[in-house]
């Protein structure tokens, strides 16, 4: 066996690439290299996420992958992280009288897996979050099971674990070409070097279709969507540290405590080309207006603004599995289209990717939550 040929090259060192690489390397049975185009891992979507662990957020398979992740997040392996991955937060969905039907549907869905989700009236809403204008927001429900996620800690845990298991991360390593011959992929990098591997894992985030095109794969129809966010000061005299995340019934805004401030967003999803995305002033202004309209908060000037990309295929589920182009590419594997759910479900989808990549049976933790690999296969995107 040629020792210069790796088992797996993972392209992309965001949460998807880091978690899958760790899963592949964790028992020491495979050689794994992660290639990251940027000078640091997690620069794009992962590093800009306002992640919340919420089991009834996203389409059904995302919810299943999220539920399958909880036990790992609550009790990771010894030494995986230096601080807890999850911290108590809770979530509060709020709505006007006209949004009762939306809240009814969301509450019913939440109860399927979060029996603690409870409906609240105006007085109860205001008791939880005193800044709410309960003349307008008259209905809602709370789920105390939602958690804040230490995104950086989780991401670094996967990368540290990868290195401890003999894997390697190489930054400033842009892929320029991909070619397969005799069951081996040759990956040409921008610095003129080459890497050879039996399998390429496409975890390139918003650039996953572009990487697929370099390999000759049919596109999965990935659409990156910009979401803007901002932080702002908590009003004098208010203690917001214990507030839940507040989300409007129509997902027109959200805000939550964040490191001594409040973090807000218009929850926009604007289709854009893959890029180092920046916030639009109109997005931020819209978010501020929507939050101020239904609260007593006055956001005179955000302390920080940013934007991130959330990438989707048509049905909103992820694309995880072997290439299924009309002429499939052997050894080319997709881990893409995480949408806005790639942090909360990272352990689940990376475990699924490991099972598929290594030809293992579906892990019992995934099966128990109703994960169905065929519903996540790129085949549904590449073949229509």
Cite the ranges covered by each PLM segment.
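Glycine-rich FAD pyrophosphate-binding loop
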Residues: 25-46
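Dinucleotide-binding Rossmann-like beta1-alpha1 core, especially the glycine-rich loop
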Residues: 50-128, 252-253
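Helix-loop-beta segment of a Rossmann-like dinucleotide-binding subdomain
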Residues: 82-93, 106-107, 113, 119-122, ...
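Helical element adjacent to the flavin cofactor pocket in flavoenzyme catalytic cores
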Residues: 142-191, 195-198
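Central helical "cap/lid" subdomain
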Residues: 193-242
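Active-site lid/adjacent beta-loop-alpha segment flanking the redox-cofactor pocket in flavoenzymes
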Residues: 218-221, 234-331
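C-terminal catalytic lobe of FAD-dependent flavoproteins
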Residues: 293-384
């Amino acid at each position: 066996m040629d020792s210069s040929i790796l088992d797996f090259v993972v392209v992309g060192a965001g949460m998807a690439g880091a978690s899958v690489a760790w899963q592949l390397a964790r028992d020491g049975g495979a050689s794994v290299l992660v290639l990251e185009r940027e000078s640091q891992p997690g620069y794009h979507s992962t590093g800009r996420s306002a992640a919340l662990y919420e089991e009834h957020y996203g389409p059904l398979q995302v919810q299943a992958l999220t539920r399958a992740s909880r036990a790992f997040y609550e009790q990771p392996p010894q030494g995986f992280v230096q601080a807890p991955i999850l911290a108590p937060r809770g979530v509060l969905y709020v709505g006007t009288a006209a949004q009762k039907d939306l809240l009814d549907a969301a509450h019913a869905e939440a109860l399927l897996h979060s029996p603690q989700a409870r409906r609240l009236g105006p007085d109860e809403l205001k008791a939880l979050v005193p800044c709410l204008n309960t003349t307008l927001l008259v209905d809602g429900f709370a789920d105390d099971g939602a958690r804040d996620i230490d995104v950086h800690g989780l991401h670094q845990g996967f990368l540290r674990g990868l290195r401890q298991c003999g894997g390697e991360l190489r930054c400033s390593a842009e892929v320029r070409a991909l070619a397969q011959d005799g069951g081996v992929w040759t990956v040409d990098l921008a610095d003129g070097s080459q890497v050879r591997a039996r399998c390429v894992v496409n975890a390139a985030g918003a650039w996953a279709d572009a990487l697929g095109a370099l390999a000759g794969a049919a596109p999965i129809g990935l659409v990156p969507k910009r979401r803007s966010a901002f932080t702002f000061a908590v009003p004098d005299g208010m203690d917001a540290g214990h507030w839940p995340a507040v989300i409007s019934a129509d997902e027109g805004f959200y805000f939550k405590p964040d490191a001594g401030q409040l973090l807000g967003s218009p929850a926009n999803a604007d289709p854009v080309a893959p890029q180092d995305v920046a916030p639009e002033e109109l997005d931020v202004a819209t978010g501020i207006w929507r939050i101020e309209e239904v609260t007593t908060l006055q956001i005179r000037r955000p302390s920080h603004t940013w934007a991130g990309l959330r990438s989707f295929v048509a049905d909103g589920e992820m694309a995880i599995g072997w290439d299924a182009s009309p002429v499939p590419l052997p050894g080319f594997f997709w881990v893409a289209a995480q949408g806005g759910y790639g942090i909360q479900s990272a352990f689940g989808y990376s475990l699924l990717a490991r099972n598929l990549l290594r030809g293992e049976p579906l892990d019992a933790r995934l099966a128990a939550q109703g994960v169905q690999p065929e519903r996540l296969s790129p085949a549904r995107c590449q073949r229509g």
